[in-house]
Amino acid sequence: MEYAYLTDPGKVREHNEDSVIIVKNHNNEYLLAVADGMGGHRGGEIASSIAISHIGKSFRELGKLGKKEDAILWIKNVVSEANVQIYKYTEENPESSGMGTTIVLSVLTKEYLLFGNIGDSSGYVYKDKQIHKITNDHTLVNLLLKSGEITEEEAKDHPRKNVLMKALGATTNVEMDIFDVETDVEGIFLCSDGLTNMLEDEQIAKVLNEETTAEEKMNKLIVKANNRGGTDNISVAFLKKDGELSDN
């Protein structure tokens, strides 16, 4: 397995409100996660950091995920715990009112591959030199698109593109969408919208196809997004499979 993750403030924002992680546990299982925070007074930075720290720590401490049903339950529970932590922080620090974060994650074991998301950070599988989006964005624009009120072209530059219908930490309860995916993929790729607002899927895939290391690929994606304006924080995480997962 080769993997790398990277985050960058971009060219416009003063602070980086994204957080990103890849963790391997004792059972040779992998967690990838990206969070894109929002809110004033560094609130977004705190929200995404709480989410990623809690989820990463819990995964590290977990001996193994177990069966697929157990893993789905773990994902739902750990995300719910992170949600409560962010919500409580807001209650104790009123100046951070309105803070929250997106979260997209993926877990890979020998037996299964799962994705989960809240918000508009994206999860993809990498296969046959292409990336295929697994997650669905919880945005107003995506709702309008699915209901047929706007076209895909209109969605790209819609003035309310950043309006989220769901975020971690915004309410006491939040439900994560879980996706059960076939394991016969060549890689997993997660990113915040700071990348997808700058680059098309084909441009991302082109970089992933290059004969370079995972770290070099992640660096190049960030450089490309910044060259196109870097209007937001940019976070990327990529795991390239090299055959089957072993038990050690």
Regions found by a protein language model. Name each.
Residues 1-248:
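PP2C/PPM-type serine/threonine phosphatase catalytic domain
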